[in-house]
Regions:
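Conserved PLP-enzyme active-site core in the AAT-like
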Residues: 1-178
């Protein structure tokens, strides 16, 4: 959850607007529906597969867009390219939680997303040995606000847990395909 929270907190501030799909893992939903609004971020929720709802919600300036595809637990699919196009027209950065898509089957950055987050605990580790996450995005984003949040709020892996994740990556392709 640290990856999702850090990725979003690095993009939005008090007075900003976030548009998110409703179809989210429970803790992700709490971040966008309860935690960020307490800090003055306006959150607008839409049904992920419904492009008309995205279009309507993105008719106003927006700082960020967030969705999972496939979503957890409903496995709803969001059109990454279409939502990214709408979001960019509204001035928003697109954050995709690709935990179920995995980098084996889905590469959101190739379809217009700006930032991708993963729960490393699931498919990257594959064994449930490590709690962790990953954030992928432009170097200036990672080196700037993401690094600042990680350094000062603590969601970083130990060297051993990073090594365990590397071991999981060695077999991830085989595991997710079978």
């Amino acid at each position: 959850m640290s990856a999702v929270f850090t990725a979003l907190a690095a993009l939005v501030a008090k007075g900003d607007r976030l548009v998110s799909s409703r179809g989210l893992f429970g803790s992700c939903f709490v971040i966008v529906d309860e935690i960020l609004p307490r800090w003055g971020v306006e959150t607008v929720l839409v049904d992920g597969p419904d492009l008309d709802q995205w279009r309507a919600a993105l008719s106003e300036p927006t700082a960020a867009v967030f969705f999972e595809t496939p979503s957890n637990p409903m496995q709803e699919l969001v059109d990454i390219a279409a939502v990214s196009e709408l979001a960019h027209a509204a001035g928003a950065q697109v954050v995709v939680d690709n935990v179920f898509g995995t980098p084996v089957f889905s590469r959101p950055l190739e379809h217009g997303a700006d930032i991708v987050v993963y729960s490393a605990t699931k498919h990257i580790d594959g064994q449930g040995r490590v709690l962790g996450g990953a954030i992928l995005g432009p170097q200036e984003y990672i080196d700037g606000p993401v690094k600042n949040l990680i350094r000062h709020t603590g969601p970083s892996l130990s060297p051993f847990n990073a090594w365990v994740l590397l071991k999981g990556l060695e077999t991830m392709d085989l595991r997710v395909r079978r």
